[in-house]
Amino acid sequence: MASVFPRLRKGAILTFDPATGVPIGTIMLQYNPETLTRSLQPQAVSEEPDRTEIFRLKGPPIETIKAEVEIDATDQLGAHVPDPVAVRLGIGPQLSQLELLVYPSSTVLLANEALSLAGTIEILPMESALTVFAWGAQRITPVRITELSITEEAFDPRLNPIRAKVSLGMRVLNVDDVGFITPAGSLYMAYQLAKEAMAAQAPGRGA
C-alpha cells in the first residue's frame, strides 16, 4: 500500500477504501504549514496503578495532530495564462475537498433514507473513507479528522474565496482503534516501526 504514496516534498491528505486499501483521492497541501503541533497521551493501565502495574501500558498513546494550512489562488490567477478553474471558482474546489472529509457521501445518505422509508429497522452508521496524513516519508499515518475550521480571508468579484486559512485537527488511529489486519492497521504499524527505527539513530542510543 505504501507504493501509492506520491514522492513529494509537500504534505498531503489521502483517502482510501477502508476495507480494501484502494486509493480514492489525494489532497496536496499547497503550502506546508510552518508548524505542526503533536500531542501524545500515554495509555496507562489505570488512573492510579499500583506498584505491579506502574510500568505497564494498555496500548499505543493517543496521538493528536494540529496544523494550520494556507490555500491561496494568487499564483493561479496571476499566471500568464490564468487557471480557468481558479478564475471561475477561486479555491472553492480545494476547500470542498477538505470539507468532504467529514461528510458521508450523498449516495449513502440517499440509500439510508430509502432503507428508512422501506421500514428497515436497523440501519448501520455510515462508513467514511480511510483518511491518511502524509508528512514526509517517515510519517504516514491513518487519522480521523476531529476538527476543521476555515477562515476565508479574500474573495473575487463573484464572492468565491481566493485565500483561506484552514485549521486541521486530527487523531492518529492506532491498532487499538482499527485492529492489525486492516489497511489502517498496517499503515499504523509501519508508522510506529519507522518511529522506532528513527529513535535508534539518535545520539547516545544504547550507550
Task: Tell where the protein language model's regions lie, with residue ranges.
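Acidic, Ser/Thr- and Gly-enriched intrinsically disordered low-complexity segments
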Residues: 1-207
